[in-house]
Amino acid sequence: MFTGIINGTATIVYIEKKKKKYRYTVELPSNLSKNLKLGDSISHNGCCLTVKLINNSFIICDVIQETLKSTNLGILNIGDSINIERSIKYGDEIGGHIISGHVMNTAEISKMSKSDNNCVIWLKMNNMSLMKYIFYKGFICVDGISLTVNDIIKNEFCVNIIPYTFLFTTIKDKKNGSLVNIEIDFYTQTIVDTTERLINNNLKSLYD
């Protein structure tokens, strides 16, 4: 589990591309590699990956084909930065919202507006069926960052980025057309899906 509060960014130093998976070598800042163990979960751009090997500040994680297809990890290159969050432990503060690290799809940045104290990003889902889970002032996880939906117009929604988040995450490297990972809030998805199922069952019973 994660909270969407990014601990820092890391750099991809090597990518081994195999037929059914990629193997990433990532260099972590020293504060993020402290007490890290084999088998630990760590969020890469919002994707929960398992630490397979550790060598000082370098870690290796495998990314399977399904994850490569549904996230932006498959288009990353050596030298790219990624958002990193260590998994939460019992008693840790939850500064954002509960995030599983199971990215559902990507969204494309359609517009970025920057000012001295704010950055507004408009996003367009690549899987439009996920838009039914987007609500005004609802939670959304973008590249591992816990954010709030600030507006919705047709098939696009926007989020606001505060200066701290802009400077200390990969958001500062984004531009129009960039792909970001999206995880819908679990509780929102559960409510929407349950309500839909109940309505459909009730409608079906009326005509049976």
From Swiss-Prot:
InterPro entries: ATP_synth_asu-like_sf (IPR023366), Lumazine-bd (IPR001783), Lumazine-bd_dom (IPR026017), Riboflavin_synthase-like_b-brl (IPR017938). GO terms for biological process: riboflavin biosynthetic process. The keyword Transport does not apply. Lumazine-binding repeats lie at residues 1-97, 98-195. It is an enzyme of class 2 (transferase). It catalyses: 2 6,7-dimethyl-8-(1-D-ribityl)lumazine + H(+) = 5-amino-6-(D-ribitylamino)uracil + riboflavin. Pathway: Cofactor biosynthesis; riboflavin biosynthesis; riboflavin from 2-hydroxy-3-oxobutyl phosphate and 5-amino-6-(D-ribitylamino)uracil: step 2/2. 2,4-dihydroxypteridine 2 binds at residues 48-50, 62-67, 101-103, 137. GO terms for cellular component: cytosol. Keywords: Repeat, Riboflavin biosynthesis, Transferase. GO terms for molecular function: riboflavin synthase activity. Coiled coil: none annotated. 2,4-dihydroxypteridine 1 binds at residues 4-6, 146-148, 160-165. Its EC number is 2.5.1.9. PROSITE patterns: LUMAZINE_BIND. It holds the Pfam family Lum_binding. It comes from the Bacteria. Homotrimer. Catalyzes the dismutation of two molecules of 6,7-dimethyl-8-ribityllumazine, resulting in the formation of riboflavin and 5-amino-6-(D-ribitylamino)uracil. This is Riboflavin synthase. It comes from Buchnera aphidicola subsp. Acyrthosiphon pisum (strain APS) (Acyrthosiphon pisum symbiotic bacterium). The gene is ribE.
